[in-house]
């Protein structure tokens, strides 16, 4: 009961609960599963626009819930090619976000979120997915269209009749001093306050290594290789076991994980080329509680989870 309360009511991650009780993360997952089976915890998954949350009643989604403790989402059939699959993922994610009917939305970055943004831009009328929209991370370099957070927010806000909030910083500061100066700016304070009030966060689940590499060598040195990073959520890198890799020289500017944990709906979105290890690793962190992903990625991630616990 205490484990279930910490996870579902206090929004603690499975890794945090494991640390509190001195048990393994798989044991926490097992206890949460038993709580559902015994009726201690009841989770209702409704279609977009119904009840409080979205879901598809898909057996693969059920497997993700059993394996990783997520609350809902959608598993998307693979198309004849990656482009078709990514379009289907973007369309499904839009329906899910609209079905949540929440006010304050935070947007990550990446190619699949860029596809979603382009889908919104092409729509005939407004796509209502939130009343206020802000970026979750600073802006990428020139020429990286899908990693320019303010542009993604601008387009989405314009075509959803939402109020935008922008961040006037790069995705990564060059030094600790520059990071501190950035965090002292009025604009950063406004964005931080927007992060504190979020109802929904849409985050890209990416691979490691990746292109672009997000200045990973400057931020982490050899840590990502030594600690065997497999994936990424926003600009945080994770291991297959679900641990976020930390570095004293990581000066990334993005929503702090302690604020992300408090967001009611954290929707992780995967493209056709997301590696199953990346999805599994990110879900094991406990920060993502809704997922939109292609079926082949989901099925392989579930199998990896079974292999890890054999």
Task: Indicate residue ranges for each PLM-predicted region.
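Key DNA-contact positions within bacterial/archaeal DNA-binding proteins
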Residues: 26
């Amino acid at each position: 009961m205490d484990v279930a309360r910490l996870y579902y009511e206090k929004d603690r991650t499975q890794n945090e609960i494991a640390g509190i009780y001195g048990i393994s993360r798989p044991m926490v997952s097992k206890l949460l599963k038993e709580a559902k089976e015994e009726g201690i915890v009841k989770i209702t998954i409704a279609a977009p626009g119904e009840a409080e949350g979205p879901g598809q009643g898909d057996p693969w989604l059920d497997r993700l819930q059993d394996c990783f403790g997520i609350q809902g989402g959608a598993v998307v059939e693979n198309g004849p090619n990656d482009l078709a699959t990514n379009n289907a993922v973007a369309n499904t994610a839009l329906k899910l976000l609209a079905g949540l009917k929440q006010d304050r939305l935070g947007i990550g970055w990446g190619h699949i979120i860029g596809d979603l943004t382009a889908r919104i831009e092409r729509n005939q009328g407004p796509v209502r997915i939130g009343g206020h929209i802000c970026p979750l991370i600073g802006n990428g370099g020139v020429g990286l269209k899908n990693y320019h957070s303010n542009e993604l927010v601008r387009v989405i806000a314009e075509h959803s009749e939402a109020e935008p909030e922008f961040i006037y910083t790069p995705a990564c500061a060059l030094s600790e001093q520059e990071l501190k100066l950035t965090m002292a700016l009025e604009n950063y304070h406004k964005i931080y306050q927007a992060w504190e009030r979020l109802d929904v966060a849409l985050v890209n689940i990416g691979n490691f290594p990746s292109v672009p590499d997000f200045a990973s060598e400057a931020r982490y040195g050899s840590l990502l290789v030594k600690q065997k990073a497999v994936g990424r959520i926003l600009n945080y890198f994770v291991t297959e076991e679900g641990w976020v890799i930390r570095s004293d020289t990581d000066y990334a500017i993005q929503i702090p994980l302690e604020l992300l944990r408090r967001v009611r709906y954290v929707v992780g979105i995967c493209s056709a080329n997301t590696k199953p290890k990346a999805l599994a690793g990110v879900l094991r962190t406990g920060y993502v509680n809704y997922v939109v992903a292609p079926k082949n990625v989901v099925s392989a991630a579930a199998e990896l989870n079974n292999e890890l616990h054999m």
